[in-house]
Amino acid sequence: MATKIRLRRMGAKKNPFYRLIVADSNAPRDGRFIEEIGFYDPTKQPEVLNIDEEKAMKWLATGAQPSDTAKSLLRKAGVLAKYHESKK
């Protein structure tokens, strides 16, 4: 089972917020997921980003591939830098 770290859209029309989830790569965007590892609210000022680093590191270590947007959010939170440091 190939897993992806990606965003799940939540909220009302024209007022989105996103949950960062781990899901099977074949599952639909807002469908079934394995675990929630954080959330992102771009509508707040400043933007709210909360990621459980421990869960994210665990899933990255097991081979979950982040989507492009999820990768940029993980980089913004400093999780990717810590992951690459732990691999060395």
Swiss-Prot record:
GO-annotated biological processes: translation
Coiled-coil regions listed: none
Assigned GO CC terms: cytoplasm; small ribosomal subunit
Disulfide bonds: none
Record's keyword terms, sorted: Ribonucleoprotein, Ribosomal protein
Alphabetized GO MF terms: structural constituent of ribosome
Pfam families reported for this sequence: Ribosomal_S16 (PF00886)
UniProt cross-references to HAMAP family, sorted A to Z: Ribosomal_bS16
Protein family membership: Belongs to the bacterial ribosomal protein bS16 family.
Protein's recorded name: Small ribosomal subunit protein bS16
Originating organism: Desulfitobacterium hafniense (strain Y51)
Taxonomic lineage: Bacteria, Bacillati, Bacillota, Clostridia, Eubacteriales
